[in-house]
């Protein structure tokens, strides 16, 4: 009987499908397309059989809050959630990356970083490996970098919120910068906060470079919102607008010359305003900017669905148009080097053999005529043995040349495997250069008609998924009939609409991944 026990990655994918069935059913078919894409990635060797491309994206909307020390990130999060979840103040003690999600039992809890590192539903799945790559020995200390907090706030239903420790690129550990880049890549919305009480951005150019310069050139730069927080502290300045102007100049020097620049502060902790007109002006600006920020945060659920589908299409095209051609080029390079190596080596061996036989007097003009030659040719056994020896010598020399070329190629690829793409190529080339594979075939192993059909099917599915999402949230014909999907989305973001009937338990209502009580998944 065949063993039908699912592999760990299959079990994780099955668990993901079960959660999506209850919480985001429109993405169920997308998971199946990721499974098809995994088959191609496994067959060409770019991805180990124990991994899935689906784990490279969190399946729940994600909002991250980055910023400098004392920028008010924790206070902003507490006000947004309506709960004192994060420690705030000038000497905040939360020095870890904190993932915040909805609580299943209505209680606020703090869970260790291991809860994130081992769960593919969250954005830090297996992040310990990335930490270990840049800081040897630190991968086992994942709890020193990460923590998971749960909160019963209704605003967390359907999304994940991430709070980061105060950012300072000058003093930041490489491992912390790696995690920050990981967050930025996966987030649907990134709030970048600065402290208006420190109006000298010129003194923090490295930090601005990492938080601004490296983000505005990204294809998804529209997901970044730059916020000047605690702006109320400038109310007593002779010219408060100059503080804002100083920050705008500093950000412009870092490359941010366009885009929205928000100004906020905490009303409860605001400094007293001596002039009512100044207070009213600050509050009006603050309320308008906060409304825009919270509206963008409410929209991430829609953006996440498009982003997951977009990544599926991007991965399929990247495999077909980047990974596979790169594998073919590397194999062609190996073929060329091996043939040249064989030619040079056999040429040198041939020249040495001719020289030795000439010195031994085995040549009669241009005819090879040693005294034992006719006897070997006349005996089929001896001639067969001699032919076998020659073939063996030539084969062994070819093996040594091939081994040297492959080893040097893999060493070079491993040195460039610091990126996801580089790792894929290194993995694939190990599979494509197995000793039993000939170097004469430069096409990628595992890439055939079936894999081509799978890629084409995934691309068709991606287009269909986008059209399905468009049908849910748009009406190109101008039909005035309310779209049920949009009505559902708006009701989900209305706290009053989320309250369950008195005779229906609250836990039946849909939410983001709620970890308490779900350890088995």
Walk through the language-model features, giving the residues of each.
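Charged, low-complexity cytosol-facing tails and large interhelical loops of integral membrane proteins
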Residues: 168, 179, 423-521
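Conserved nucleotide-binding/hydrolysis micro-motifs of P-loop NTPases
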Residues: 105-107, 166-168, 197-200, 231-234, ...
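Conserved C-terminal guanine-recognition region of P-loop GTPase G domains, centered on the G4
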Residues: 125-159, 172-254
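Cytosolic-side membrane-insertion boundary helix
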Residues: 307-349
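Conserved G1/Walker A P-loop phosphate-binding module
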Residues: 2-141
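Transmembrane alpha-helical hairpins and terminal membrane-anchor modules
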Residues: 336-423
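Canonical P-loop GTPase G-domain recognition
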Residues: 223, 231-304
């Amino acid at each position: 009987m065949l063993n039908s026990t699912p592999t760990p990655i299959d079990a994780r994918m099955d668990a993901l499908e079960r959660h999506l069935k209850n919480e985001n059913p429109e993405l169920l078919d997308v998971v199946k397309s990721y499974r098809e894409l995994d088959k191609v990635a496994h067959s060409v060797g770019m991805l180990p059989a124990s991994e899935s491309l689906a784990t490279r994206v969190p399946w729940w909307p994600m909002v991250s809050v980055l910023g400098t020390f004392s920028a008010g990130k924790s206070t902003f999060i507490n006000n947004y959630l309506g709960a004192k979840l994060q420690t705030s103040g000038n000497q905040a003690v939360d020095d870890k990356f904190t993932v915040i999600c909805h609580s299943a039992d209505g209680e606020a809890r703090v869970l260790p970083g291991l809860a994130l590192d081992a769960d593919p539903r969250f954005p830090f799945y297996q992040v310990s490996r990335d930490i270990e790559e840049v800081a040897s020995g630190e991968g086992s200390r994942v709890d020193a970098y990460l923590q998971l907090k749960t909160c019963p706030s209704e605003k967390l239903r359907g999304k994940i919120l991430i709070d980061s420790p105060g950012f300072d690129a000058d003093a930041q550990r490489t491992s912390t910068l790696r995690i920050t880049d990981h967050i930025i890549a996966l987030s649907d919305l990134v709030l970048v906060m600065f402290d208006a009480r420190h109006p000298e951005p010129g003194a923090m150019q490295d930090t601005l470079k990492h938080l601004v310069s490296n983000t505005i050139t990204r294809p998804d730069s529209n997901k970044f919102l730059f916020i000047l927080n605690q702006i109320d502290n400038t109310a007593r300045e002779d010219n408060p607008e100059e503080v804002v102007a100083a920050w705008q100049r500093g950000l412009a020097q870092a490359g941010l010359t366009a885009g929205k620049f928000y100004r906020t502060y905490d009303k409860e902790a605001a400094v007293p305003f001596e002039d009512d007109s100044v207070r009213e002006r600050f509050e009006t600006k603050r309320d308008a900017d906060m409304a825009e920020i919270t509206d963008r945060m409410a929209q991430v659920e829609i953006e996440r669905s498009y982003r997951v589908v977009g990544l599926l299409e991007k991965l399929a095209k990247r495999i077909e148009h980047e990974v596979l051609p790169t594998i073919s080029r590397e194999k062609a390079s190996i073929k060329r080097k091996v043939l040249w190596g064989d030619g040079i080596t056999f040429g040198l061996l041939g020249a040495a053999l001719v020289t030795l036989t000439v010195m031994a007097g085995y040549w009669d003009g241009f005819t090879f005529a040693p005294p034992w030659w006719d006897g070997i040719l006349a005996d089929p056994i001896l001639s067969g043995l001699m032919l076998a020896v020659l073939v063996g010598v030539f084969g062994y020399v070819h093996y040594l040349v091939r081994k040297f070329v492959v080893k040097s190629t893999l060493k070079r690829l491993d040195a460039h495997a610091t990126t996801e793409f580089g790792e894929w190529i290194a993995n694939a080339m190990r599979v494509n250069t197995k000793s039993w594979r000939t170097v004469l075939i430069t096409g990628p192993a595992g890439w055939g008609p079936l894999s081509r059909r799978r890629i084409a099917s995934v691309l068709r599915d991606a287009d269909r998924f986008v059209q399905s999402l468009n049908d849910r949230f748009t009406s190109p014909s101008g039909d005035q009939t309310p779209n049920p999907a949009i009505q559902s989305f708006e009701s989900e973001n209305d706290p009053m609409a989320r309250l369950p009937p008195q005779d229906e338990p609250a836990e039946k209502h849909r939410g983001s991944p709620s970890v308490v009580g779900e350890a088995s998944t």
